């Protein structure tokens, strides 16, 4: 399954708030579809999702929020299984430490897709090397910086709001537009409401 590039509100209506995917919020809590307003969530008490459907929904939330395709997510699950610790938590750590997510968390872009564009277009350096791979996994003590001829673009966004709260795992110099990674982003700082164990269960019989 390729990366999604269509309208975002129907996805948010189906999966709930996805902070990395879009700033949009479904204030009416209506399901997707032309007549979704007739089928508000409060009127669907009789509708019960299957266990498979619940796990699928959690998996989709991860995919859309972090902007990854099915093959990428499978690879992350496999890598999480190989590492020490809770597989679900390690999976979230891998996704949170992607360069596109770090750029988003620093407030350099409003969403992860927007952060990915900055990286793809060569605006970002890691340890003084230009990195144009959004899936690059950042490490502790990495230094993230913005190319000089690209800094005004980022400063304009920061002046218009930027990020409301910077993770304690990141240290940002707003004047230089340079940041250091102090620690791995832990589970309790993940913004997405997700049950990662259900994602691991979803793949338990597929991998």
From Swiss-Prot:
A GO BP entry: ribosomal small subunit biogenesis
Single GO molecular function: structural constituent of ribosome
Record-annotated S4 RNA-binding domain positions: 97-158
Keyword GTP-binding: no
Record keyword rRNA-binding present: yes
A Pfam family this chain is assigned to: Ribosomal_S4
Biased composition (Basic and acidic residues): 40-52
Cellular compartments annotated: Plastid
GO CC terms of this entry: plastid; small ribosomal subunit
Keywords, in A-Z order: Plastid, Ribonucleoprotein, Ribosomal protein, RNA-binding, rRNA-binding
Region feature Disordered, mapped onto this chain: 20-52
Assembly notes: Part of the 30S ribosomal subunit. Contacts protein S5. The interaction surface between S4 and S5 is involved in control of translational fidelity.
Function statement: One of the primary rRNA binding proteins, it binds directly to 16S rRNA where it nucleates assembly of the body of the 30S subunit. With S5 and S12 plays an important role in translational accuracy.
Family named by the database record: Belongs to the universal ribosomal protein uS4 family.
Protein's name in the database: Small ribosomal subunit protein uS4c
Lineage, broadest ranks: Eukaryota, Viridiplantae, Chlorophyta, core chlorophytes, Trebouxiophyceae
């Amino acid at each position: 399954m390729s990366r999604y590039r269509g309208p975002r509100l129907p996805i948010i209506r189906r999966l709930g708030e996805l902070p990395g995917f879009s700033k949009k919020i479904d204030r009416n809590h209506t399901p997707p579809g032309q007549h979704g307003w007739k089928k508000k969530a409060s009127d669907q008490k009789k509708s019960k999702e299957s266990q498979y459907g619940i796990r699928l929904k959690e998996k989709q939330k991860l995919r859309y929020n972090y902007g990854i395709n099915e093959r990428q997510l499978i690879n992350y699950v496999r890598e999480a299984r190989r590492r020490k610790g809770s597989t679900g938590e390690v999976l979230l750590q891998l996704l949170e430490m992607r360069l596109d997510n770090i750029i988003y968390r620093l407030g350099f872009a409003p969403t992860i897709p927007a952060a990915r564009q900055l990286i793809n277009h060569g605006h970002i350096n890691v340890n003084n090397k230009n990195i144009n791979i959004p899936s690059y996994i950042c490490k502790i003590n990495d230094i993230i910086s913005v190319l000089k001829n690209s800094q005004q673009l980022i400063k304009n966004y920061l002046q218009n709001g930027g990020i409301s709260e910077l993770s304690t795992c990141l240290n940002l110099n707003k004047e230089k537009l340079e940041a250091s990674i102090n620690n791995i982003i832990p589970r309790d700082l993940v913004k997405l409401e997700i049950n990662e164990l259900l994602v691991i269960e979803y793949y338990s019989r597929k991998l």
